[in-house]
Amino acid sequence: MGGVTIRLFETEDFLGCAALAAQFRSELDALKGIVREPSLKRGEQELQDYLDANFFVYVACEAQKLLGFAVCRVDGGVVWLEAIFTSPAARRKGVASALFCEVERLAKGNGEPTVYNWVHPNNEKMLNFLAKRGYRVLNLIEVRKAYEGENLTQKIPVGEREFDY
């Protein structure tokens, strides 16, 4: 991982981080079957929403170039990972692991033994990433209306029930 630094977000990171957030949101949309080009405006709004809510935003950078980010919400001492993303060029180089370690440090600093994660059920990359760190899917079913343009093409069995997905 060489000269990669993990630090808290600074104001001058805004545009670079917003561009990464736009890519992140586009990739998450694809998991729901929604194809959208990354929108810098959407990324800026998402990042601003995190900042306005006083979420912790960590960035990974090397030679002043942003490689990725992680966003955490702390609720009653419990740390929730809201987002973690690395640019495609920075993947499989330990950048996301370094970001996640910083998030785990935040949780431990709050006296919590774990970070809570909200993961889309077919985000295999994230599920595998977390599994390597000892995290397991325990419980959680998202109940909401389908997004506009979202195609629910699968069924997921949970116990005696079957849910649209």
Regions found by a protein language model. Give the residues of each.
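A short beta-loop-alpha structural element at the N-terminal edge
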Residues: 3-19
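Conserved GNAT-fold acetyl-CoA-binding loop/helix
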Residues: 11, 25-46
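A short helix-loop-beta-strand connector motif used in the catalytic cores of GNAT acetyltransferases and
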Residues: 45-59, 80
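Conserved beta-strand in the GNAT
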Residues: 59, 65-73, 80-85
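Conserved acetyl-CoA-binding loop-helix of GNAT-fold acetyltransferases
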Residues: 86, 92-105, 128, 132
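Conserved GNAT acetyl-CoA-binding A-motif
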Residues: 107-119
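Conserved beta-strand-loop-alpha-helix junction that forms the acyl-donor binding cleft
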Residues: 117-126, 148
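Terminal substrate-recognition subdomain of acyl/acetyltransferases
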Residues: 132, 136, 141-165
